[in-house]
Amino acid sequence: MDILKNKIVINELFEKGKYLSNGSVMIKFLESDSNGFLFAVSSKKFKRAVDRNRIKRLMKESARKINVNNKRIAFVYIGEGLPTFEIINNSINNLLSKIWS
């Protein structure tokens, strides 16, 4: 699993990418020659870094098993309150099934 770190690549993903959303997770995705993931949680909604890091770890674990070819995907948590792994996993799987169908 490759993590997106280049600012130019991230800006291109958010400017040109398409998005899907449900109640707790938003996904921005863009077809490209390489693949990579980005995980984000708003610091306005979650003041403590411990909470933000936990949510990002849950999203990473859910996305770890995904085999993506030639897509850059940003996972942004937009829900309220601390989620469980089941909530994150179901949200991400539902959104990814919409991308590939």
What are these regions (language model features)?
Residues 1-101:
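Positively charged, solvent-exposed patches that mediate nucleic-acid binding
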